[in-house]
Amino acid sequence: MEMILEEKDASDWIYRGEGGANLVLAYAGSSPLFVGKVIRIQKARRNDKAIKNANGVVSVLTSDEQHLWRENNELISSPNKEVLEQRYVKNVIIPLLGPKHVDAGVRVSVSKEFLECVDKKVTKQRPLWRVNAANVDTSHDSALILNDHSLFSQGISSGGDCISVEIKPKCGFLPTSRFIGKENMLKTSVSRFKMHQLLKLEYNEISEESEYDPLDLFSGSKESVLEAIKALYSTPQNNFRVFLNGSLILGGSGESTGRTSPEIGYAFEDALKGFIQSEDGHRTECFLQLVSDAVYGSGVLDRLLEIQKLDKLDIEGAIHSYYDLINQPCPICKEGKPLEAELSLHALPLDESLKIVKEYLIAATAKDCSIMISFQSRNAWDSEPSGDYVSLKPTNQTFDYKVHFIDLSLKPLKRMESYYKLDKKIISFYNRKQKAENTAEQIGNSKPSHS
């Protein structure tokens, strides 16, 4: 008999965090079926209805999206978001990232009452702006069960403490596309993340700029990777979280957090006691070294970067192919005099335009996903490591570790338009800031000095 999560089961699930489209809850009950699992529940989004295509196949994708993904029959016949997400990870992402670090999850049936109860239960723990934006979509009859990668071993604990780190790496390369406008050339020398920080600061979405630069994390240099991890620890925002045995000990749940204060730093140092065998005042430093060594040694970011680089044309190029795909006149070309390069995009066969847009959206998944690294200390009497491990020289400890990619959501086709608008907003604001700074510098330099 198929299992259905009912209203009475809602109390076993606790809020873990959320993104734009999903809530994530961790299991705190005793059923062996769910110990070591999280549940991913869709949030309510307008116009999320299944559509019949010309062949009468029901799909949650729009007709343009069905055309875009037409080579993948399983994907285009997805009747709801849970099925779509699972099939996208299984059929599109796993062939690119490999099965070792990706979990497609399994679907579980849920009752309306379960979803309503969960929605009510977690409201107080959610950031207010997230609550105002969307609630649980109670019209769904299934949710996605995934392994809880904040725990080292799923199922019953193997005894040792587990510390896990969640990193949202963001885009790790500078674009070189010939479609980038002359006025936007700063995009080729400053990371998108750094530019976006200025805009977020202007709109009070963050309290200060992050010290982190994704280019360091993806650099392939051991020293730069460590710098990136230290910067993430200092200014976590929503890019860095740490869990001890599944409980959050650093970072925010579902929202951006400010700088790591001395008080938070002391509490974190204390939480590492027993896990990192070092003197007081040195545990955090050793831990950040451990994370850095695992990121560098695993090589997972190299593969992720390859997928991010499927965005070959930048949004300034891909947007033209998008309008060809949806069969609409290109408003960007209408705005000004289109360049020869842009016209050449509109002259491409439709299959080429489809490929450009599809690869751009897959790259967008890779730019927005997170990686989860779980660590467990090895004892001297443990058998030889069978999986990945890292040695921490200052403490003479060895840790087994596992790396998983999470939040590998399919981006809606319609989002191409908002990607283009946001990109324009980010670069024009950054350009204005740079000009203002240069002008202020020139004025400062031209002032006569009084000796």
UniProtKB/Swiss-Prot annotation:
Keywords from the named record: Acetylation, ATP-binding, Kinase, Metal-binding, Nucleotide-binding, Transferase, Zinc
Q: Which organism is it from?
A: Arabidopsis thaliana
Q: What is the required cofactor set for this protein?
A: Zn(2+)
Entry's family note: Belongs to the IPK1 type 2 family.
For the ligand (substrate), the binding residues are 45, 130, 170, 200, 238, 368, 411, 415, 419
As for what it does, the entry says: Phosphorylates Ins(1,3,4,5,6)P5 at position 2 to form Ins(1,2,3,4,5,6)P6 (InsP6 or phytate). Phytate is a regulator of intracellular signaling, a highly abundant animal antinutrient, and a phosphate store in plant seeds. Also phosphorylates Ins(1,3,4,6)P4 and Ins(1,4,5,6)P4 to produce Ins(1,2,3,4,6)P5 and Ins(1,2,4,5,6)P5.
Disulfide-bonded cysteines: none
What does UniProt note about where in the body, tissue by tissue, this protein is expressed?
Answer: Strongly expressed in leaves and cauline leaves. Weakly expressed in siliques and flowers. In flower, it is expressed in the major organs of developing flower buds. Strongly expressed in sepals, petals, in the male and female organs of immature and mature flower buds. Strongly expressed in the gynoecium and carpels which are fused to form the gynoecium. Also expressed in the transmitting tissue and ovules.
The gene name reads: IPK1
Read off the Gene3D superfamilies from this record: Inositol-pentakisphosphate 2-kinase, N-lobe (3.30.200.110)
- Binding, Zn(2+): 320, 330, 333, 346
Motif EXKPK motif, per the record, lies over 166-170
Q: Which top-rank group of organisms is this from?
A: Eukaryota
Q: Which residues, renumbered to this chain, carry the PTM N-acetylmethionine?
A: 1
* Positions annotated to bind ATP: 19-22, 40, 147-149, 166-168, 241, 407
Q: Which reaction does it catalyse?
A: 1D-myo-inositol 1,3,4,5,6-pentakisphosphate + ATP = 1D-myo-inositol hexakisphosphate + ADP + H(+)
Spell out the protein name for this chain.
Inositol-pentakisphosphate 2-kinase
